Amino acid sequence: MNKHHIMPPRDADPNRPSWMRLCAWSAFFATLPSGVWRVLMIVGFMPGTADFRTFQLAGEPTLGYVYVFGLSIVQVTCGYLAVGLIRPWGEHLGQWRIPARLPVFLGAVGSLALIWIFNVQMVAQVALGHRPDAGLIHNWALAVMLWCYLPILLWGPLTLATVWGYWQCRAHENSEAYPRGETSSP
C-alpha cells in the first residue's frame, strides 16, 4: 500500500488550531471533577459528606439518586459536546454537513448560560454566604469539594472560546470554498 494514500483516522482532529483543541478538551475535563465528586458523595464513598448525603436523599431517596446521577451525566455529556467542535462528528451527521450556525448558536447560548450559572450566580451566592452544601460539609471534606468544583468555573469561558474558534474555522473554510466573491454563511 502506498503511504501517500493512507487516510487519517476517522476521528482525527480536523485542521483546528492547537489553542482551540486545548480549550475544547479542557472544557470537557472541567466537568469531570465535580461530576465524579457528586456521584461519590451520593453513593457514600466520599468521607466527610454523610450529613450532606442525608440532606440530598431526604424525602424520596430514589429521586435524590436519579437527580444526582442524571445531573452528573448531563453535565459531562454537555462538556463533551465542546469536543465535537474540533472533531469530524461535530460537523457531519452521516453524509449531512451540519450548518455552522447551529452549533455556534447552541454553543454560544450554552456557554453564556454556564457563565451566568457558575461564574456569576454561584460565585455571588458563595460571596453572600450561601453555600451550595448548606453548611453541612467541613474541614478537609470541604476543601476536597471546593477543589472539585473550582474547574467548573472554566467550563463556560473555555466552551465560548471553542465556539468562537469553530465559527472562525468554518468561516475560513467557506471563504476558501467560495473564492470568487460568492458567499455562503458559515
Regions from the PLM with identified roles:
Residues 2, 73-81, 147-163:
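Hydrophobic cores of alpha-helical transmembrane segments in multi-pass inner/ER membrane proteins
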Residues 5, 9, 16, 86-94, ...:
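Cytosolic juxtamembrane helix at the C-terminal end of the final transmembrane segment
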Residues 14-32, 100-110:
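Alpha-helical transmembrane segments and their helix-start/interface "positive-inside/aromatic belt" motifs
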Residues 33-45, 112-128:
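C-terminal TM-helix exit segments that contain a strictly Trp-centered aromatic cap at the helix terminus
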Residues 49, 79-97:
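Membrane-helix interface/capping segments
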Residues 59-76:
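Interfacial helix-start motif at the membrane-water boundary
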Residues 100-106, 135-155:
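Individual transmembrane alpha-helices with interfacial aromatic-anchor signatures
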